[in-house]
From Swiss-Prot:
This is Small ribosomal subunit protein bS18. HAMAP family: Ribosomal_bS18 (MF_00270). Binds as a heterodimer with protein bS6 to the central domain of the 16S rRNA, where it helps stabilize the platform of the 30S subunit. The keyword Cell membrane does not apply. It comes from the Bacteria. It holds the Pfam family Ribosomal_S18. Belongs to the bacterial ribosomal protein bS18 family. Keywords: Ribonucleoprotein, Ribosomal protein, RNA-binding, rRNA-binding. InterPro entries: Ribosomal_bS18, Ribosomal_bS18_CS, Ribosomal_bS18_sf. Residues 1-20 are annotated as: Disordered. GO terms for biological process: translation.
Amino acid sequence: MSEINQTVTRRPFHRRRKTCPFSGANAPKIDYKDIKLLQRYISERGKIVPSRITAVSQKRQRELANAIKRARFLGLLPYVIK
């Protein structure tokens, strides 16, 4: 009585790549005066959320970071949220 070992081969799981929310026809423009938009990309502690979480492209992430920093400098956004 020989036992046949069958290994179960699983297909690899590929997570679908998210698209950049700032690319496309109806995409919002990144502006330092648009506080509601900028607050979506700031964590609860006031830090800028990385692009691997928000799926923002590298170019738009730099623009977003500069807009957040400019809004902080002008007093529109806080540096730290307590």
